């Protein structure tokens, strides 16, 4: 007999971070556990991170606090492989349903962001400035002038559940930047997912491989096949958000 597909369902449960940078709550909604138990949130449950380790992933889990009422837990234990579809539980504990992941900074608080698209697949998080005083986006590649394929590894910044990185490509150079997923052939003027032409700064939804990596190539060859003789300027990539499944 096949698995009941309802045990992977999740509705609502949009995560939000308080101004203190350590208190997390979720909006009204519900989710199922593998044993078919349904737990519901009325929007009042929250959890506060205490004694946090800097620069560490913390994963938010929902569990049944009694009578189907939802409670929340933050843990450094990563989610297990999906048990059905994209639904995951805490590794070693099927009573905890995975909701979202945050990463602490050097001060032991979460970098703020907006969980803008809650769902089972394709959840989107847009990262905010790191403090009320403002900050620059996270730079993941700076001053690129090399014309060889570069692998961008985001495993230290994005959770294991991440499927796409939302990247701004700042290309004031005279060359063209091509991007690709690491699991397929290297990017080139004839094989790419996205392109940033000279003088452009597009925002790209870059597909990640299973290791949370993607590849880029800065090339003298344009998308029309022409060749630029001289490189001036360089390319910078910044991380502005990501998508994940749950």
What are these regions (language model features)?
Residues 183-213:
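Glycine-rich strand-loop-strand elements at beta-sheet edges
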Residues 1-25, 78-146, 246:
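Glycine-rich, low-complexity segments
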Residues 93-111, 165, 206-229:
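Noncatalytic modules at the cell exterior or secretory-pathway interfaces
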Residues 30-33, 52-64, 112-193, 236-245:
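Beta-rich globular "head" domains
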Residues 227-238:
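Extracellular carbohydrate recognition
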Residues 48, 150-156, 199-209:
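Exposed aromatic-hydrophobic patches
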Residues 47-50, 138-141, 203-205, 226-227:
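Beta-strand-rich interaction surfaces with strong enrichment in secreted/lumenal proteins
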């Amino acid at each position: 007999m096949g698995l009941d597909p309802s045990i992977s369902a999740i509705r609502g449960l949009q995560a939000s971070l308080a101004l203190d940078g350590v208190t997390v709550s979720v909006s009204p909604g519900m989710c199922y556990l593998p044993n078919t138990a349904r737990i519901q949130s009325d929007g009042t449950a929250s959890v506060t991170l205490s004694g946090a380790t800097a620069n560490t992933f913390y994963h938010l889990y929902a569990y049944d606090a009694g009578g189907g009422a939802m409670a929340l837990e933050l843990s450094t234990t990563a989610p297990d492989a999906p048990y059905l579809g994209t639904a995951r539980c805490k590794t070693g504990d099927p009573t905890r349903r995975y909701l979202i992941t945050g990463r602490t900074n050097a001060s032991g608080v979460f970098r703020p962001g907006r969980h803008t698209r809650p769902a089972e697949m394709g959840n989107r998080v847009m990262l905010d400035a790191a403090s009320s005083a403002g900050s620059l986006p996270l730079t993941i590649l700076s001053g690129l002038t090399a014309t060889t394929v570069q692998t961008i590894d985001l495993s230290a910044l994005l959770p294991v559940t991440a499927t796409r990185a939302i990247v701004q490509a700042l290309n004031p150079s005279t060359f063209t930047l091509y991007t690709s997923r690491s699991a397929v052939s290297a990017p080139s003027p004839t094989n790419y997912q996205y392109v940033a032409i000279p003088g452009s700064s597009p925002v790209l939804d870059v597909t990640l491989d299973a290791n949370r990596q993607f590849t880029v190539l800065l090339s003298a060859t344009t998308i029309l096949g022409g060749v630029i003789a001289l490189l001036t300027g360089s390319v910078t990539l910044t991380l502005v958000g990501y998508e994940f499944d749950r």
